[in-house]
């Protein structure tokens, strides 16, 4: 007598496949927004950290050289300005769009602006921040200077760094949660804080006063 043995199929049934796809869709629906938020928070942290490093370096250099050292938002054809090429393209942006990068220089002639290489000394150039980042100074003049004592050569400064959402809005709850502020006291010391405000209270630059 011949015995016929049945062999189980090695694949999935249609029902099993549909269930697996549905489960994958659920996982992705939670994972993608979380990953997107993680990336945006990393952008904010990276931008703030770079700014603080350069800010502290400028302050130290001012005390070392006993001259004013200025950091200003990059303007003009910024892509042709680097730390080794102090050309006419290395100019400050008086509109204060710090997300385009910034320039640090020794203000030898004391005019607050980056002059020719024979006059002022360029210390460094930071490239533009990641796409979607908005980094502005509350005063809007686009520069901050330290004197020979490491203190501010001017009034206190506040900087706001915001990460826009996919729709480009800047005042919803998520954007405020990702916002970071840098307050520079007259002593030259910088402090980072987070936004403490309800949705809708931020301006287009998300300048929100942190809670005391």
Question: What are these regions, as identified by a protein language model?
Answer:
Residues 8, 109, 185:
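Short, acidic, Ser/Thr-enriched surface-loop or helix-capping motifs
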Residues 69-145, 201, 212:
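Type IV pilin-like appendage domain
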């Amino acid at each position: 007598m011949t015995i016929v043995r049945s062999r189980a199929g090695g694949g999935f049934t249609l029902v099993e496949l549909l269930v697996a796809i549905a489960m994958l869709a659920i996982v992705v629906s939670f994972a993608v927004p979380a990953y997107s938020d993680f990336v945006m928070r990393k952008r904010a942290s990276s931008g703030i950290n770079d700014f603080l490093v350069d800010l502290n370096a400028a302050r130290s250099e001012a005390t070392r050289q006993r001259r004013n050292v200025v950091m200003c938002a990059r303007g003009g054809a910024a892509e042709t300005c680097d730390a080794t090429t102090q050309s006419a393209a290395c100019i400050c942006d008086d509109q204060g769009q710090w997300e385009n990068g910034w320039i640090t220089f020794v203000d030898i002639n004391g005019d607050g602006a980056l002059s020719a290489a024979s006059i002022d000394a360029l210390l460094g150039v930071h490239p533009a921040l990641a796409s979607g980042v908005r980094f502005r100074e509350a005063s809007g003049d686009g520069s901050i200077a330290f004197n020979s004592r490491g203190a501010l050569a001017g009034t206190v400064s506040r900087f706001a760094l915001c990460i826009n959402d996919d729709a480009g809005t800047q005042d919803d709850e998520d954007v405020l949660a990702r916002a970071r502020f840098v307050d520079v006291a007259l002593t030259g010391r910088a402090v980072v804080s987070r936004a403490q405000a309800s949705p809708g209270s931020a301006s287009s630059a998300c300048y929100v006063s942190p809670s005391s």
